[in-house]
Amino acid sequence: MTEIISPHSINLDFLEKIFRNKLEIVVDPELETNVAKSYEIVQKSAEGDLPVYGVNTGFGKLANKIIPSEDREQLQKNLVLSHCAGIGEPLPEDVTRLMMVLKIVSLSLGASGVKWSTIKQIERIINSGIVPEIPHQGSVGASGDLAPLAHMAAVMIGEGFAFYNGEKLSGFEALKKAGIEPITLGPKEGLALLNGTQFSTACALASLLDAWRSVLNSIVISSLSTDAIMGSTSPLLPQIHELRGHKGQIFVASKMRELMDGSVIRESHRENDQRVQDPYCIRCQPQVLGASLDILKNASVTIDIETKAVTDNPLVLVDENKIVSGGNFHAEPIGFAADQIALALAEIGSISQRRIALMVDPTLSYDLPPFLTDDAGLNSGFMIAEVTSAALMSENKHLANPCVTDSTPTSANQEDHVSMSAHGAYRLFKMNKNLNSIFGIELLCAAQGVESRQPLKTSPLLQNAVDELRKHVPRLNEDRFVANDINNVSNLLDKKNILKSSKLDLPISTFFNL
């Protein structure tokens, strides 16, 4: 199936489908007319005598240097090659494809002055399976993500490096094997390809999609943990959350009620329970997860807008027949969104770790065995798994420090305030991975705890989650190499097995309905 790419029809659900699957794409042909008009304006300006940034001038601090007409084709190639200064591990292939799709979307809005064939070159590269090698370090998020996007543009002209059928090749060799001719860049085209926030936006969007999955996983796992320690469901009463009014909080409480409905464990201690109130990590789950969900929703609105934005400079105003300089390349909105996502991930992991600690502590777990193991002493059970969760939680807290406030001047002070969006968005991959491992440990503990309550049973939906877990990881009856268990469960969470079994696999568009 071929997916049509148009800025007028994409949304986060569509982009998730593009991100999760290697789909063939085609740029909406109806966009070609406006793109052609934009390119024509640039061509005319290139033939004139007035200086136009990026068309007949140098770049950055060198913008006052006028470039002779005979050197302007070389100017664009030089721009791409000189800006291929990124280092570090390459961007994951699925995120690279997402970045290229976002670049297509931005260019196809017809305000960047590129040829239609240049946009189609990106389309051809995506559909061929070529993945440009994009080093993840080198962008400060203004003027756009210059270095990462330069590495993408380099492959388009037969330079740089790319992966094709699992093999790392030169850009030229990758194109040759795929039957694609390198293109020659016209006036402004190199600048249009490099200027933009698509690296930062792709990283932030991919991380947002994973963060949404994490919130849903957390709702399921925290509900199971609540049952494991025989926590009260009274704090989930709808009246409590409606009195406060936060949409995320109301949503989380509602889903937890649905998941825990029918739990025999819960009914067994509804009356005559001497505990008046549960610890905050149980009682305040809707408040903490709900606040995290709300801040992710804020980030999703920003990212959704940015996926359909023109973040080039200068911009071509087709209706006014002119080219203007601006600052849409500054990725401050994405920098803020990335910091918001980081805060949410850190907090979700923090409260998850406290639930793990609660379940393994026999003085707090309401008669669960020490460290959730039989014959404690001979067996250590989940003792060190809990320590691992604490280490991951602490790392995520450190990674959650804001990046957007860490501006530094670059390019001889011409670009004197930057967003640091690229680093802010890229670190989210590590945070999501850490969080998934914390959840893996909590799910192992919660399932073990619920099973320790037998013959009492948890709710049907939560039992489905436990049953799905046990298809892949057996109960810990005696000590074994537990790292494998954690990795296996993290993989299940990645694949949404637990969400599907508990009927909570909801699309990210649910955000906008809260």
Feature locations, PLM:
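Cysteine-centered functional microenvironments
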Residues: I134-S139, D319-I323
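C-terminal auxiliary extensions adjacent to catalytic cores
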Residues: T2-L23, V27-N34, S38-A46, R72, ...
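Conserved, non-catalytic sequence blocks in retroelement Pol enzymes and Pol-derived host proteins
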Residues: A111, V140-A142, G377
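Polyanion/phosphate-binding surface patch
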Residues: L50, K65, V252
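FAD-binding core of FAD-dependent oxidoreductases
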Residues: Y53-I67, D71-L75, S82-V105, P135-I157, ...
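Glycine-rich, flexible loop motifs
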Residues: T2-V42, A46-D49, Q76-P135, T226, ...
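A broadly conserved amphipathic alpha-helix scaffold signal in soluble, globular proteins
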Residues: K120-N127, A147-A154, L216
